[in-house]
Swiss-Prot record:
Motif (Histidine triad motif): 258-262
Residue positions, PTM Phosphoserine: S118, S123
Source taxon at top rank: Eukaryota
Catalysed reactions, semicolon-separated: a 5'-end adenosine-5'-diphospho-5'-2'-deoxyribonucleoside-DNA + H2O = a 5'-end 5'-phospho-2'-deoxyribonucleoside-DNA + AMP + 2 H(+); a 5'-end adenosine-5'-diphospho-5'-ribonucleoside-2'-deoxyribonucleotide-DNA + H2O = a 5'-end 5'-phospho-ribonucleoside-2'-deoxyribonucleotide-DNA + AMP + 2 H(+); a 3'-end 2'-deoxyribonucleotide-3'-diphospho-5'-guanosine-DNA + H2O = a 3'-end 2'-deoxyribonucleotide 3'-phosphate-DNA + GMP + 2 H(+)
Residue span of motif Nuclear localization signal: 112-117
EC number: 3.6.1.71, 3.6.1.72
Region: Interactions with ADPRT/PARP1 and NCL, residue numbers: 1-96
EC primary class: hydrolase
Domain notes for this protein: The histidine triad, also called HIT motif, forms part of the binding loop for the alpha-phosphate of purine mononucleotide.
A Gene Ontology molecular function term of the record: single-stranded DNA binding
Active site: H260
The FHA-like domain, residue ranges: 24-73
Protein name: Aprataxin
Amino acid sequence: MMRMCWLVRQDNQHQRIKLPHLEAVMVGRGPETKIIDKKCSRQQVQLKAECNKGYVKVKQVGVNPTSIDSVIIGKDQEAKLQPGQVLHMVNELYPYIVEFEEEAESPGLETHRKRKRSGNSDSIERDAAQEAESSTGLEPGSDSSQCSVPLNKGKDAPTKKESLGHWSQGLKISMQDPKMQVYKDEQVVVIKDKYPKARYHWLVLPWASVSSLKAVTGEHLELLKHMHTVGEKMIADFAGSSKLRFRLGYHAIPSMSHVHLHVISQDFDSPCLKNKKHWNSFNTEYFLESQAVIEMVQHAGRVSVRDGMPELLKLPLRCHECQQLLPSIPQLKEHLRRHWPK
């Protein structure tokens, strides 16, 4: 019985790639992956399968960002890719998963294969999409316990217009969809986060094309102020009667290409809050306060993000109210109940 590992493109654009045990395999732009995007290096990642341990070591070799579950690995840095996680080759594009199989040869019989997956294919795509932060049709204040997402499969799956991105395209479409809009004016639109990490979780997006915080200049100062004002309006209009505390801010390294302001209640009462990366993205310096961003642009004309931000996502789980350390997400969630308003 021999264990094998395969790299599988989720949109089935090419045949799966074999990753031999402990053998370094370079993957990137080229005929094998059918990736022609020049932002993807020919040697974008180095993959080394640990077949006995059930994961793949991923080293980002290319300049542009490679991510696992929307967390950027970083140039010359390594991360583990496990079954159920999604590797985006570059710039949140070209999604891959890994599959482990046990192969046994029997005389006169075809090779018998058992595929090891973390859940079914639907759950894999659903978890991958969670980091995309696109919108949902839920009404403000409605039950956030439903974290399902309709899936595009087969010929209906988006394979063209790759410049928009596999997941970011969904966000831009949601901005334009009246059913998804909670509020809009001439400058911004507000949509409900598709995978809310708390009872209330909105995204405020400008109509103007601003790719990320790195693209923000002094010319965007009034827009940032307006986005903040609209975020406060959402709290007043839809959560004013609650005693919940809110924060407004941006992820230092967002998973989406279109800049967006998070407006999120501090209860973190949501089944979509599933792992340490989710928690730390909102409860460490990875989450940049909206007012702090405004002040940076006001004084320096740009937003500065310090090095080492991805490492913050790996920090131990710590309660944001009392600073107590918790060993797991379920225990953290149980602990948070004591801090909810009575």
